[in-house]
Amino acid sequence: MAKRKVIKKKIVRKNIAKGIVYISATFNNTMVTVTDEMGNAIAWSSAGGLGFKGSKKSTPYAAQQAVEDAMNKAKEHGIKEVGIKVQGPGSGRETAVKSIGGVEGIKVLYLKDITPLAHNGCRPPKRRRV
């Protein structure tokens, strides 16, 4: 039986100066995606993907780590200026936005909230009783 060859996928460097950072902060997790201006994904990260499990995924610290990981990946592709689009009501939302400003060599152009608001659409989940 022949041995399988392990082929490593080569990371292609894209020299992109401007990008958009999408932060999706849910109650359970925080996802960060960095795209170019056309919407093609360059880098992404999430709190769960970094090893945070269970209730630790929804913490502000996990959101900060996810943003720093995604921005470091994006800096390898030459990103220098970003616009931020935030979605969702999660607890890591504010920390994620602040930590983008703290990344060295990245200039924030704008900040926009793209959370969808229902005009009396679906019934929301029932209130929690703890």
Swiss-Prot record:
Gene3D superfamilies xrefs: Ribosomal protein S11 (3.30.420.80)
Similarity comment: family membership: Belongs to the universal ribosomal protein uS11 family.
Subunit structure: Part of the 30S ribosomal subunit. Interacts with proteins S7 and S18. Binds to IF-3.
Protein origin, superkingdom: Bacteria
Keywords of the record: Ribonucleoprotein, Ribosomal protein, RNA-binding, rRNA-binding
A Pfam match: Ribosomal_S11
InterPro entries noted in UniProt: Ribosomal_uS11, Ribosomal_uS11_bac-type, Ribosomal_uS11_CS, Ribosomal_uS11_sf
Stretches assigned to coiled coil: none
GO process annotations (BP): translation
PROSITE patterns the UniProt entry points to: RIBOSOMAL_S11 (PS00054)
Any single GO CC term annotated in Swiss-Prot or TrEMBL for this entry: ribosome
Alphabetical list of NCBIfam families matching this protein: PRK05309.1, uS11_bact
General function of this protein: Located on the platform of the 30S subunit, it bridges several disparate RNA helices of the 16S rRNA. Forms part of the Shine-Dalgarno cleft in the 70S ribosome.
Signal peptide coordinates: none
GO MF, any single term: structural constituent of ribosome
Gene it is expressed from: rpsK
Full protein name: Small ribosomal subunit protein uS11
Organism this protein belongs to: Campylobacter fetus subsp. fetus (strain 82-40)
